[in-house]
UniProtKB/Swiss-Prot annotation:
Residues 54-71, 158-167, 192-201 have a biased composition (Basic and acidic residues). It comes from Danio rerio (Zebrafish). It comes from the Eukaryota. This is B-cell CLL/lymphoma 7 protein family member A. Belongs to the BCL7 family. Residues 46-201 are annotated as: Disordered.
């Protein structure tokens, strides 16, 4: 009798392990690696971000995305506890994607962060706005002018991102900010120094 009970126990443990593995695979399918900016700085890192799945049933597109993700390393982020939280858009955290390399995601998702073309337009608009605000101030060199454009474009991106994230839940925003600060490794004091140096120039 003891042999049968041991086998049954092993079988039930194996079933639990299979369930755990399948849940981990489902989590990985909803995340992908992308280039994102860190806060208001120009620092870009390649990290795992949640995939926003469209509500329309594009099974072919989803299968292509799954095949692409298996080539990279398999990790599950520690701040993803339920599938409902993973479906939220990654703009809730203080990051935005700059170079979205997958055209598949641009076609399928409606509320992704701006693609490179709108960003280029926003940089031109922000530089025109900067020139209109300060017509008497002429930059002494090309580098000063470029730094002003970069600073202004980062401010416009931040304001767009803030307006998008106001409609989403506040608790997820706080948890994702703290998780990103841990992942990025850049302390808030360093970010403050970068912001103050860009304001001085």
């Amino acid at each position: 009798m003891s042999g049968r009970s041991v086998r049954a126990e092993t079988r039930s443990r194996a079933k639990d392990d299979i369930k755990r593995v399948m849940a981990a695979i489902e989590k990985v399918r909803k995340w992908e690696k992308k280039w994102v900016t860190v806060g208001d700085t120009s620092l870009r890192i390649y990290k795992w971000v949640p995939v926003t799945e469209p509500k329309s049933d594009d099974n072919k597109n989803k299968k292509k995305g799954k095949d692409d993700k298996y080539g990279s390393e398999v990790t599950t982020p520690e701040n993803s506890s339920s599938p409902g939280m993973m479906d939220m858009h990654d703009d809730n955290s203080n990051q935005s994607s700059i170079a979205d390399s997958s055209p598949l995601k641009q076609e399928t998702s409606n509320n992704t962060s701006p693609a490179p073309e709108p960003m280029a337009a926003s940089q031109n608009d922000s530089s025109d706005l900067k020139n209109d605000q300060y017509p008497s101030k002429q930059p002494s060199s090309g580098q000063d002018h470029k730094s002003e454009q970069n600073h202004c474009s980062s401010e416009s991106m931040t304001s767009k991102r803030d307006s998008k994230s106001q409609g989403d839940s506040e608790s997820f925003l706080d948890s994702s900010k703290s998780a990103q600060e841990l992942e990025d490794g850049a302390p808030p004091s360093k970010k403050g120094k970068i912001d103050s140096s860009s304001e001085e120039s």
